[in-house]
């Protein structure tokens, strides 16, 4: 097992990507290369950046990848809002995704703070 796989925040990011894939399966076929693809790519980017960042030799470098992962998470929030407004995402689906985003955001913020506050 790689070290990043032991991180609870990485495990939660994988779960979040699963949630995004499940929810976007219900989107119209016309969005296959639009919001569906964008949301999935952004969701996958979260765990990918955590994995890549964990390989860096310094804590500030890892923290930068956590920051990028957070940006990807915020992309998903924006895309979910658009999806809801367009009628592709139900209120229940949106709330489920938003709640998962809030949890993931707190975890990413905590990891970033710990990386920047700890000695290298």
Where are these regions (language model features)?
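Amphipathic alpha-helical assembly/interaction segments
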Residues: 1-120
């Amino acid at each position: 097992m790689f070290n990043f796989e032991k991180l609870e925040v990485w495990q939660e990011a994988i779960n979040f990507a699963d949630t995004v894939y499940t929810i976007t399966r219900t989107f119209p076929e016309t969005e296959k290369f639009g919001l569906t693809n964008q949301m999935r790519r952004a969701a996958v980017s979260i765990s990918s950046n955590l994995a890549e960042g964990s390989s860096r030799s310094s804590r500030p470098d890892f923290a930068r990848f956590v920051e990028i992962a957070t940006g990807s998470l915020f992309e998903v929030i924006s895309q979910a809002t658009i999806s809801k407004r367009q009628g592709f995402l139900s209120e229940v689906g949106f709330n489920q995704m938003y709640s998962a985003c809030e949890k993931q955001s707190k975890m990413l913020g905590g990891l970033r703070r710990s990386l920047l506050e700890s000695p290298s």
